[in-house]
Amino acid sequence: MSPRIGVMLSGRYRLHRLIATGGMGQVWEAVDSRLGRRVAVKVLKGEFSSDPEFIERFRAEARTTAMLNHPGIASVHDYGESHMDGEGRTAYLVMELVNGEPLNSVLKRTGRLSLRHALDMLEQTGRALQIAHAAGLVHRDVKPGNILITPTGQVKITDFGIAKAVDAAPVTQTGMVMGTAQYIAPEQALGHDATPASDVYSLGVIGYEVVSGKRPFTGDGALTVAMKHIKEPPPPLPADLPPNVRELIEITLVKNPGMRYPSGGLFAEAVAAVRAGHRPPRPNQTPSSGRASPTTIPSSTQARAAVACGTKTPAPRRSRPSTSGNRPPPARNTFSSGQRALLWAAGMLGALAIIIAVLIVINSYAGNEQHQPPTPTVTDTGTPPATKTLSGFPAAYCEYRVNWTNHKEISNSGLPKQAARAQLAGATDISPVAGQT
């Protein structure tokens, strides 16, 4: 039987008002009869109460969130399983009742946040996530609906319902996607393990939305949106935003998780630098592994691709001296003075042709570049700075896009089969009840 007003759970928590409903359960305002305080009680939906997997996930949420103690994380007070009107056991989670409003509701009213409030919210959220990341936990469903804003501007992260300990066995099936499509990291959309960098990506999507008033990726369905996170670059942010703010969001939304800020704390430090008027620091990037291939002369198409991605053509390898026995030196070719003159002229013409071709390529890209705002690129730590990208986004995106779009698990039909069957809309979406505040 579904919970209703007046129901008492375990002889202690009396349900008073339905606040919100979501994929896994309902959130109620309740009264703790022992301590005389108001609390929030998340009650698992009746259709899931007999499902051992959902019960275990619900217990995991209680254990996970109870480990975290920070002003920016809604506290967990209790967990229990109670008979409800003799209709079987129902699991519930007792949490801090936050006097606040979900960020998604704020955005529905205001469209976007002021830059000052947006950066403050992002820094607070990053610092709160760092507590989980330092404990080896990943939220995996960071989105505006899980960020509460109090009247004083304090951020409270809620709903660690699909959080997972990095070193523990996953509750979900291998390859199953957990998260909300509009804010999901590319690696999560592919069914790969989420990391703290996945939470940072989701927070970057939120950052894009709060400063621009729109999400970077939209579509007709969850799968369409998820595929855009995997394959497409975000649209350029409004030109009226400060360059360091645009750079911060662009760094955070690169496809390669190894090239993002690796934790909420480092993301928060980057936001703090931007708030102080500085450029965001570059994350410690994990360069792609691989052996260098033999040097070849690139075609004109390859050369243009290299310029667009901010890469440099590798220098030709020097020939190694032979270690074999002494060999007689090759016979010298002798040329007449006329032949030498012809060879010299041919060499000059060849060099001139190369110079002209290079100038044509440079001029063509310079013409294109005039219409795009200059954006500093992200480079690997310890390597020379990359050349400026022409897309307006860091070179890391252009470099890694090929790896993601050619991933062995991606087919022409889209996501992996298991991922496509998963509920990309999120298992723990929380939607306020109509008429409730």
From Swiss-Prot:
Topology feature Cytoplasmic, residues: 1-341
Regions of biased composition (Polar residues) lie at 285-303
List GO BP terms, alphabetically. regulation of primary metabolic process
Task: Enumerate the subcellular locations listed in this protein's record, separating them with semicolons.
Answer: Cell membrane
Reaction catalysed by this chain?
L-seryl-[protein] + ATP = O-phospho-L-seryl-[protein] + ADP + H(+); L-threonyl-[protein] + ATP = O-phospho-L-threonyl-[protein] + ADP + H(+)
Active-site residues, as the UniProt record annotates them: D141 (proton acceptor)
- Protein name as it appears in the record: Serine/threonine-protein kinase PknA
Query: What organism does the record attribute this protein to?
Result: Mycobacterium leprae (strain TN)
| Gene that encodes it | pknA
